[in-house]
Amino acid sequence: MRIKEAFEKRKTNGQKALITYIVSGDFGYETTKKNIMSMVNAGADIIEIGIPFSDPIAEGIVIQEASQHSLEGGTTLAGIFKMVKELRNETDTPFVMMMYPNTIYRFGTERFFDLCNECGIDGVIVPDMPFEEKDEIQETATAHGVDNISLVTPASHDRIESIAKDAEGFLYCVSSIGVTGTRNEFTTDFDAFFDVIKKNTEIPCAVGFGISGPQQAKKMSRYCDGVIVGSAIVKIISEYGEDSPKKVYEFTKGLRDALDE
C-alpha cells in the first residue's frame, strides 16, 4: 500500500514521483543509512535498495564497481535486512529491493519474503527474471504482502501489453535496451511505448535506466508517473564515500526541484 500511496500523493498534487537507487553496504551500512535518509529528506518518494551481486548483468560499470566494493566490505543480505529494520524507525518511505533471482533462491524464497515482510520491504525488482518465470516467486511474494515489480522494455506491442496487464506496485519502464548507466540522449519512441502501457494498466509507471540529472528527469517525467535515478547517485557515493550524504542530498534535491518546476 505504501507504494500506491506514494504515487497517489504526488499525483493529487500534480507532481511526479521520484525513485532513487543505492547499492547497499557501499562504504558500510551506516553510510548507506545516512544516504537513504538524505534522499528521503530531499524529496525521494521510493527508495530502491540494491543488493550487491558478484555478476550484475543488467548493470553498467558504475553499479558493478559499487557492488564489488560493497561485497569486499562484507555486506550480506542478512546485514541489509537488519539495516532496513533500523531505518524503519526513521521513515515510512516505501523500500523496494532490487536483486537477482539467485540471491533469493540461495537465501530461501520463503525465508526471504518472510524477512521482507518483517523488516518493511514493500516490493522487489528482479531484473533478469523473465516475465514468464515470474510465477516462481509470485505466490510467496503475494502471501507476504510484497509487490513483485516487473520491468518492461520497448519491445513488441504484444509483450508490452502482457507485462502491463500483469503489473503490480509500479511498472519499471526501461528507457532503452542495454545496461544501466547515464546517457546523453534516448532513441526510444516514448509516446508509442507509454501509449501501449497506459492502455493496458492503471498501475503507475516509472521510467529508469540512464537518467543522469535534473533536466533529463524533468524531460522524461512527462511520459509517466515517476522517474528512477540510480547510477548518477551511485557515482556520487563512489566519489565521496563516507562524506557522500550531503552531496547525495543536494543532488536528490536538484532532481526533486526540477520535477516540481
Residue map of PLM features:
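Catalytic cores of alpha/beta
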Residues: 29-39, 155-165, 207, 211-227
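Glycine/Thr-rich beta-alpha phosphate-binding loop at enzyme active sites
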Residues: 65, 73, 161-199, 236-238
